[in-house]
Amino acid sequence: MAEKAEATVVFGVLNETSEHESRVALTPDIVTRLRKSGVTCLIESGAGVASHYVDEDYTKAGAQVVSADDVIARADALGFVDRPSNELLARVKQGTWIIGMLGSFTDADYVAAIEKAGLVGVAMEKLPRQLSSAQSMDEMTSQNSVMGYKAAIVAANAYGSFLPMMTTAAGTIRPAKVLILGAGIAGLQAIGTAKRLGAVVTAYDVRPASKGEVESLGAKFLDLGLDFSKG
């Protein structure tokens, strides 16, 4: 594997601490790409287990699997799925870049804590979706799509019957009627998933302009005759 002789940046990833979090900020295939650009990748042992990546996968890709203390001490930049706690921020050396979903839209105090600690925050949620060159890094689209898909699957699992129409010798079961509130990224994915599962889908959004998107997926738009787009 062709690599630069000297690494210019050390990028580190720690175990996520949020309960039930199974994602990891760096996967082995991205490690390979970063190594080709001369980036040293440090992974805390076990960081990828919940995402079905073992330490050996990272080692084979060119990462160094080390302790959490090692990652914190050596990294120039740290990647996170969920933002690190204030206690963890206090352990990170000044000048380190903190990259992830930092909740910057709703928590000014947390942003201030990053600044107070002498760190550089890179809030992925503020990445402009309109930039075509940055769309592959748009966490809002990718993660909200996952949430919408999962929501439809969880609902289907919790429902006490079938979603599609089923006709057998014993009779006919009518398809389930599903109402989805919100036709943003997550809502549209939920609509598409529920339709593919065979449900009759109706969706609502406060934006009248979303009607076309809803109907393009084969769902019915619930029109309440109200326009909230102007506040």
Give the location of each predicted region.
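Short acidic-hydrophobic, aromatic-tinged amphipathic segments that line or gate anion-handling sites
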Residues: Q64-A68, V122, F221-L224
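Glycine-rich phosphate/diphosphate-binding loop of Rossmann-like nucleotide-binding domains
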Residues: L14-V49, F162-G231
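An N-terminal-biased, well-structured beta-alpha scaffold segment characteristic
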Residues: A2-A113, A117
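Short, hinge-like loop/turn segments at secondary-structure boundaries
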Residues: Y58-G62, E139-S142, G218-D223
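Short, acidic/turn-prone active-site loops that include or flank metal/cofactor-
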Residues: D70, G103-T106, K126-P128, R207, ...
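Glycine/serine-rich phosphate-binding loop and adjoining beta1-alpha1 elements at the start
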Residues: A2-V10, N15-E16, P84-K177
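Short, basic, helix/turn surface patches
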Residues: V66-A77, S145-A158, D227-G231
